[in-house]
Amino acid sequence: MKIGYFGTPEHSAKLLEALIDSQLTEVLFVVTNPDRPKGRSKIPEPGPVKKKALEYNIPVFQYESIKKEKEKALSDFGLFSADLYVVFAYGSILPKEVYAHSTLTSINLHGSLLPDLRGASPVQTALWKGYTKTGITIQYIGEKMDEGDILLTKEVEIAPEDNTGTLMDKITDAGIESILQLLKTYDGKPFPSVPQAHDKATYCGKIKSEDRILDWSLKSEELHNRIRALYPDMIATTTFRDKRMNILKTKPSSLSLEINPTPGKLKRLDKKRLLTQCGDGRFLEILELQPENKNRMTASDFLNGFRIQEGETFG
């Protein structure tokens, strides 16, 4: 099968490489976001999918807005005769003229069990909501985002210690396995599919920068889920002694709850464990954190270096 591939970040590059190595497909071209400056450098750098495509000498197309540049895109893609377009974390919505351009239209790998968690942040939102399982969906692309018919789904378990980084790895592995499984069934005809139960749809939006700021008046479980949902891409943050403090890794504490809690109050336990009181009276144990302008550290290192005082708080 001859395909065009649309994607941008690291996990999408992993799927691209799996498709190339599978020998089930011939990747004719890749479409990815334009090069962007990374870190402190002002020099634009190619993203992971572009790097992987160039490694295999696959033609790469980049558009600032594929919607506005769709005529050019269609002209570019017209140089090839792709059977199918495969999309995974491209970063832009494809106009109908583009996703319907290939012989068998286009399929998308989505990081949830549709119709649950349609939208931009299904992996983060599953963690944020405290899900114990999620999954992937391979769907046809339709006119409305994430509403296309379903070809295949696969469940993924969420472990208590998972964060967005580790869960995204699981999602990607499940997606690779499922797409290769699907491609093995190709007989020259469109893949069979079933409509979504649109009346059961739920939605998730983009994670905003203000979502990073922790409100210690929330329940400890809510805060723990938010922290792992934000890691490693955005990082939850609070303040300590009027400076920023990033909270990287936590776990709920079994310490008995207190009446009339002081949200954000710090508690030292066994001289090397750090707990923060939350709005429900329970404690959240801080495992790893990063003070402003310093490297990440364990709670034990933080306690040794900062020597917290009675009554001090985060936030």
Curated annotation (Swiss-Prot):
Q: Which InterPro entries match?
A: Fmt (IPR005794), Formyl_trans_C (IPR005793), Formyl_trans_C_sf (IPR037022), Formyl_transf_N (IPR002376), Formyl_transf_N_sf (IPR036477), Formyl_transferase-like_C_sf (IPR011034), Met-tRNA-FMT_C (IPR044135), Met-tRNA-FMT_N (IPR041711)
| Keywords per UniProt | Protein biosynthesis, Transferase
Q: Catalytic activity, per the record?
A: L-methionyl-tRNA(fMet) + (6R)-10-formyltetrahydrofolate = N-formyl-L-methionyl-tRNA(fMet) + (6S)-5,6,7,8-tetrahydrofolate + H(+)
The Gene Ontology biological process terms listed for this entry are:
conversion of methionyl-tRNA to N-formyl-methionyl-tRNA
Family recorded in the similarity comment:
Belongs to the Fmt family.
What is the role of the protein in this entry? Attaches a formyl group to the free amino group of methionyl-tRNA(fMet). The formyl group appears to play a dual role in the initiator identity of N-formylmethionyl-tRNA by promoting its recognition by IF2 and preventing the misappropriation of this tRNA by the elongation apparatus.
Q: What is this protein called?
A: Methionyl-tRNA formyltransferase
